[in-house]
Amino acid sequence: MSIVRQSCDCCRVRRVKCDRNRPCDRCRQRNLRCTYLQPLRKRGPKSIGESNLERAAEIQMVTVNNNIMAAPVMYKKVPKKVIDQCLRLYHDQLYVIWPMLSYDDLYKLLEENYEDCSTYWFLVSLSAATLSDLHTKIEYKKGFFFAGEQLCNLCMSSRRFFDDLSNSDIFRIMTYYCLHRCYAQFADTRTSYRLSCEAIGLIKIAGFHREETYEFLPFGEQQLIRKVYYLLLMTERYYAVYIKCVTSLDTTISPPQPEIVTDSRLSLDSFLEVIKVFTVPGKYFYDALATNSVNGSYTEDSLKRIWNELHISSLDIEPYSYGYIDYLFSRHWVRTLAWKLVLNKKDMRMNFFSNTNATHIPVEIAKDMLQDTLLTPIDLYDVHGPVIPMKALEIANALVDVVSKYDHNMKLEAWNILCDVSKFVFSLKHCNHKMFQRFSTKCQSALIDLPISRPLRLNDDSKDEVDIIP
């Protein structure tokens, strides 16, 4: 076996052939000092150093392909340190809106089940949803950041790892819910709705839509699944109004139980109140809105019951918090939707419009909403994505529908309130051009001229098609 000999230092620098003698002929001819101090360079494939691995993984995670059908690529896992920071943010600011697990439970999963595939991807998707909702990034190393969209794309390109069609455990369900929240923030309604449908489908496959499934589960597991079930129920009912798809989940499942906590960030008070707002109307209420029809079971009395039960806001919720905003706007929104059903039923509409007080209901709802916005910091709205602008715009639409029914004095009051509501709606970050154009067209058709030259904080990143949200 021949022994590999290296070129001398001078020949290697000059990039000339060396006879490898000591001294070599080329150095001797040119009176150069011939040395062999530089270490022998190993030939063949190089070993993969840890630093190279880290750098390659960072590049892959930043430039991950959005196409989930692309060829399989092995990614280095998102560091525990990054996930842990996201879990803390979720605990501090978002748990009250969409509660799943407390930080202690999430940290335990991170430490003990980091290598478990479905658990790991749930934690990554939760991190993605958290960063997307809060519009922030996490710095991992100097100059290298993790953003919600990067983590979301990483999850979407790795779906075959966490959803292999062999199981429908709660972690897979929560993963799809978190991804749905990401795309809602990206204003991609089609993808957001599709991902929520994936989660709802897994709920049914697992049998979590039947109360008897919960009987033999530990209380903590029951509580978690009930929270996720109602998160999806409310999501489905919201989309029923705007995507025009009938609902499938019903209130046959008991909501989660109130929990006694010393940390207000873990309180379920606002979440339970929002559940109440969404479930005071029955399933048929949302199906009627989805199909633009009112069946015989929906009466004037049932609509009045909704207004009466949701007329006074709860005093159990911490004011001017993320959960408080979610509850208030959901309450105003559902009352307005009940009014919308009145417009779809001719005999009921005639009865209501013959009553001045009933006709004035949209004005009263709008007044309540504007009162709630007076002392509320505007940054509390952004975490909810396009939901708050859509709910507020529903109230503005109701005002347009009835403003022509008023006499001169009432019309002037309604017009002033409509202007204030419109200014508020179009000052929100997630209010996009299409929403503004549709509403402006409706106002023009009703011969209403709003003194608004342009939206104040338009979001031009909406991926919604023209017909996705009417």
From Swiss-Prot:
A motif (Nuclear localization signal) lies at residues 41-49. Gene3D superfamilies: Zn(2)-C6 fungal-type DNA-binding domain. It comes from the Eukaryota. SUPFAM superfamilies: Zn2/Cys6 DNA-binding domain. GO terms for biological process: regulation of DNA-templated transcription. InterPro entries: Carb_Metab_Trans_Reg, Maltose_ferment_reg_DNA-bd, Zn2-C6_fun-type_DNA-bd_sf, Zn2Cys6_DnaBD. The keyword Transmembrane helix does not apply. It is found in: Nucleus. GO terms for cellular component: nucleus. Residues 8-34 bind DNA. Keywords: DNA-binding, Metal-binding, Nucleus, Transcription, Transcription regulation, Zinc. The keyword Nucleus applies. GO terms for molecular function: DNA-binding transcription factor activity, RNA polymerase II-specific; sequence-specific DNA binding; zinc ion binding. Belongs to the MAL13 family. PANTHER family: GLUCOSE TRANSPORT TRANSCRIPTION REGULATOR RGT1-RELATED-RELATED, MALTOSE FERMENTATION REGULATORY PROTEIN MAL13-RELATED. May regulate the transcription of maltase and maltose permease genes. This is Maltose fermentation regulatory protein YPR196W. It comes from Saccharomyces cerevisiae (strain ATCC 204508 / S288c) (Baker's yeast).
